[in-house]
From Swiss-Prot:
Single annotated GO MF: translation elongation factor activity
NCBIfam families xrefs: tsf
Name the record gives this protein: Elongation factor Ts
SUPFAM superfamilies membership: Elongation factor Ts (EF-Ts), dimerisation domain, UBA-like
Length: 303
């Protein structure tokens, strides 16, 4: 019996397995849909869809800098053990390289790219990896940064727990900007700024902070003219906490980040501008299931 595209589509919808593997299963079973499902289950592939319901909050953040272009990717798995698996790490690194080489700015585009040496695309290779390793995994998010001239520097902290990109626009060579870029990326990893500068502060966040500060100042019983000066000072402190260029430089807290950039520009003999940054912390925002170890032991003992 000839295997049709609609049959492959139906089997994929039933199992969550990649197109090529579905086609092979149908070919091996003479087009028998139920037999094809069983064939995939025996190969450990059809279980991948069920695993997708499990929380994947571990994994790793990967980065790749290609001079004026930088890419960062977060790939999640269920356990830290799997995050150190060679096949998982190879997949994460390969996906990052593919994203950089093909100009990817979103996960769907990345998933559609051919995964080298497999006959599958990136999304289907991920499904295959889920079935092989036996854990849910997820290509969670991607960031791509580019400058017309200069360097996009990258940094990985704690073996992939935190990743950073920093974009430096400058006529200086990428090599000349390497040290500054790396140190600024390390600063971002440690200080976790929320915005690049005052101009990029979200207006809602700014008004919310200002409202809180006004209420606090009024509670002190000070007159309005004094309160106004207090708010200006406290907002300056707020900006110094959340804006990268106004933060105290972690390597030299006596200087702000912008001062460090200005000093580097003077030394290089040309302007240097930080045009953007991105920071991924592994698993941030993912709600993890809290395990009650004592309850688990009791359950096992009680049978």
């Amino acid at each position: 019996m000839a295997v049709t595209a609609s049959m492959v589509k139906e089997l994929r919808e039933k199992t969550g397995v990649g197109m090529m593997d579905c086609k092979k299963a149908l070919a091996e079973t003479g087009g028998d849909m139920e037999a094809a499902v069983d064939w995939l289950r025996k190969k450990g592939m059809a279980s991948a869809q069920k695993k997708s319901a499990r929380v994947a909050a571990e994994g790793k953040v990967t980065t790749l800098s290609l001079g004026s272009v930088g890419v960062m990717l977060e790939v999640n798995a269920e356990t830290d053990f799997t995050a150190k698996n060679d096949n998982f790490c190879t997949f994460a690194d390969t996906a990052t390289k593919l994203a950089a080489d093909n100009g990817c700015t979103d996960i769907d585009t990345l998933k559609a790219l051919d995964y080298p040496g497999t006959g599958r695309n990136v999304g289907d290779e991920l499904t295959n990896l889920i079935a092989t390793i036996g854990e849910n995994m997820n290509l969670r998010r991607i960031e791509r940064m580019e400058v017309s001239s200069g360097l996009v520097s990258s940094y990985i902290h704690a073996g992939g727990k935190i990743g950073v990109l920093v974009a430096l626009e400058s006529t200086a060579s990428a090599d000349a900007l390497q040290e500054l870029g790396k140190k600024l990326a390390m600063h971002v990893a440690a200080a976790a700024p929320q915005f690049l500068n005052r101009d990029s502060v979200d207006s809602e966040a700014m008004e919310r902070e200002k409202s809180v500060l006004i209420d606090q100042a009024r509670a002190s019983g000070k007159p309005d003219n004094i309160i106004e000066k207090m708010i200006v000072g406290r907002m300056d402190k707020y900006y110094a906490d959340v804006c990268l260029l106004e933060q105290a430089y972690v390597i030299d807290p006596d200087h702000k980040v912008q001062q460090v950039v200005d000093a580097a520009a003077k030394e290089l003999g040309c302007p240097v501008k930080v045009t953007g940054y991105a920071r991924f912390q592994l698993g941030e925002g993912i709600e993890k299931k809290e395990e009650d170890f004592a309850a688990e032991v009791a359950k096992v003992v009680q049978g």
